[in-house]
Each structure stands twice: as structure tokens, then as C-alpha cells.
């Protein structure tokens, strides 16, 4: 068993179709936290041109080791999809965050996905938002990479990429749920 397999078994939980318990982590203004456990990937390395180019905003990709997306900050749900593969939120300090699970997963029509929140819901950092079946995504021929993007960059005074870890897998850092990823300040 390799290091990545060992980490997967460490982080994997059973019964992900039911609402998982909330995670608990401290929050600070302007900070977007890792919404899932996994291996951090530079956005420019995500195999999707619109995402990799930064056209949609700045952020990270995360190769997930678990199948639940948690709120990366306090805020409210600003967008949902009927296919449950992506979600948008507006943080308490006005940051617009878009989380997308997988590439091409819209074609799955919601199979393998469950959403635990609705449009307009107020959420706390660490609250479960979406669960997804990584094996179903791969069986459908898609990648399960999760992208976390801050959009509407013209509203920002600054954005700093802080996602890092001392543990490297294939040269990329491992991130745990609740690790800081991005620090942004609005104008």
C-alpha cells in the first residue's frame, strides 16, 4: 500500500450518502479554507482550459481523498445546480467562491452526488455541502478533481495563495479540511 492509498484509507469514512457531521475549524476574515482533504494542485495544472487559464477566477485544484465538500468559510449559498456537482457561496465578507467537483461531471446528471444545502441557506465553515462518489465519477470516465475558485477578481484589493503543507505527494502539498488556501481582501 502506497502513501496515497494509506492516506485515502485514513480519511475515508463510511455512509457518505447521509449527512456527515460538521467539521470544526477556526475562521478568519477573508480566508478561504480547504473544503476537502486531498492533494493541492495549482489551478494552471487543472486539465480544463477555462479553469487553468484563470478566466473563471483564482484558486486551486484539489485531488480529493474523501468524498464530502464542506463550506470553506461562513456565508450563504449563492448558487446550486440540479446535478449537485457544483456550488457557489458568498462569504460573510463578500467573497464569491465557486466549488466544482470533477471535470465533465455535469454529464452524470447528479448520479453519485448529494447536496445538503439549498440556495439562500446560511452556512458555517465546516458544514457539509455536497457528497460525491469518487468511484462513480471515475467509472463515468471523468476526473474527480475539485476546484475552489474566487471569482469577481475586480472586486478584490488583493488575493494571496497560502495553500501549503509540509507533506508532499508527487511534489504537491497535502491539504486537510480547514487548512487555509486563499486570503483575499475586498475593495
Sequence positions of predicted segments:
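Contiguous, well-folded functional domains in the mature portion of proteins
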Residues: 2-187
Amino acid at each position: 500500500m502506497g502513501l496515497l492509498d494509506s492516506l485515502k484509507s485514513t480519511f475515508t469514512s463510511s455512509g457518505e450518502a447521509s449527512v456527515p457531521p460538521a467539521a470544526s475549524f477556526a475562521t478568519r476574515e477573508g480566508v478561504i479554507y480547504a473544503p476537502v482533504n486531498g492533494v493541492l494542485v495549482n489551478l494552471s495544472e487543472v486539465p480544463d482550459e477555462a479553469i487553468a487559464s484563470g478566466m473563471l477566477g483564482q484558486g486551486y485544484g484539489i485531488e480529493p481523498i474523501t468524498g464530502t465538500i464542506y463550506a470553506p468559510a461562513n456565508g450563504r449559498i449563492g448558487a446550486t445546480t440540479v446535478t449537485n456537482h457544483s456550488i457557489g457561496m458568498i462569504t460573510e465578507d463578500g467573497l464569491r467562491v465557486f466549488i466544482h467537483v470533477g471535470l465533465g461531471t455535469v454529464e452524470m446528471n447528479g448520479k453519485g452526488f448529494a447536496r445538503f444545502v439549498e440556495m439562500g441557506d446560511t452556512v458555517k465553515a465546516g458544514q457539509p455541502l455536497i457528497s460525491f462518489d469518487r468511484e462513480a465519477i471515475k467509472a463515468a470516465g471523468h476526473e474527480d478533481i475539485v476546484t475552489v475558485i474566487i471569482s469577481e477578481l475586480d472586486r478584490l484589493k488583493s488575493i494571496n495563495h497560502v495553500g501549503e503543507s509540509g507533506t508532499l505527494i508527487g511534489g504537491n502539498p497535502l491539504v486537510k479540511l480547514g487548512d487555509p488556501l486563499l486570503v483575499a481582501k475586498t475593495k
